[in-house]
C-alpha cells in the first residue's frame, strides 16, 4: 500500500517549500494530500502558486496518514491562528505517536502547539528558533536535523538535504 503524506497548508506558504518536497515525495512513489481549512478551496503561496485543498481540517483524520509535512512561509502562523487549535491537535498525533513529521523554515512553529518539544533537537529559520527553545526544544543551526520521527530544516537553500532525508525516512 502506498504511503500517504498529509501536507497542512494555508495562504502565504513559501511556494518552493511546498512544491519541492511534494515533488520529491511523489517522485519516490508516495501520495500527498493537502489539508487546509476547507476542502476544494484554494490557498495561494507568497509567490503566487495556487493549490487546491484536498481535505478540510474538520474531516482530516491523522491516523489516515503515514507522515506529516509542514512547509514554511506565513502559512504556519495562519494555521496556528485557528481558533479551535485543530492544526496543533492534528500535528500532535504525529509527534506523540512517533509518526514521521517533516517541517521546514517557519513550519516547526506548528510543533510548538503539540506540547511535545521538550528535549527534542530541532532547527528552523532564525526568527522561529527562540520560540522553539521556549517550548523546550534544543535548537541548532544545521541544514537538516533528525530527532527520532521529526525532521526539520531551515530555509529553501536546504531543500536538497531536506528532501533527501524525508524520502529516506519513509523508505
Curated annotation (Swiss-Prot):
Transmembrane segments: none
Entry's family note: Belongs to the peptidase C56 family.
The organism's place on the tree of life at top rank: Bacteria
Organism: Staphylococcus aureus (strain Mu50 / ATCC 700699)
Protein name stated in the entry: Uncharacterized protein SAV1875
Domain spans labelled PfpI endopeptidase: 3-171
Amino acid at each position: 500500500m502506498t504511503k500517504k503524506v498529509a501536507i497542512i497548508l494555508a495562504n502565504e506558504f513559501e511556494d518552493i517549500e511546498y512544491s519541492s518536497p511534494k515533488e520529491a515525495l511523489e517522485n519516490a512513489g508516495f501520495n500527498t494530500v493537502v489539508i487546509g481549512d476547507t476542502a476544494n478551496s484554494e490557498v495561494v503561496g507568497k509567490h503566487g502558486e495556487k493549490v487546491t485543498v484536498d481535505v478540510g481540517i474538520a474531516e482530516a483524520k491523522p491516523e489516515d496518514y503515514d507522515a506529516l509535512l509542514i512547509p514554511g512561509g506565513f502559512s504556519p502562523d495562519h494555521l496556528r491562528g485557528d481558533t479551535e487549535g485543530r492544526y496543533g491537535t492534528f500535528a500532535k498525533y504525529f509527534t506523540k505517536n512517533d509518526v514521521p513529521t517533516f517541517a521546514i523554515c517557519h513550519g516547526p512553529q506548528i510543533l510548538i502547539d503539540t506540547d511535545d518539544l521538550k528535549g527534542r533537537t530541532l532547527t528552523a529559520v532564525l526568527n522561529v528558533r527562540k520560540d522553539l527553545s521556549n517550548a523546550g526544544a534544543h535548537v541548532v543551526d544545521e541544514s537538516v536535523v533528525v530527532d527520532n520521527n521529526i525532521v526539520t530544516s531551515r530555509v529553501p537553500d536546504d531543500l536538497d538535504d531536506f528532501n533527501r532525508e524525508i524520502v529516506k525516512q519513509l523508505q
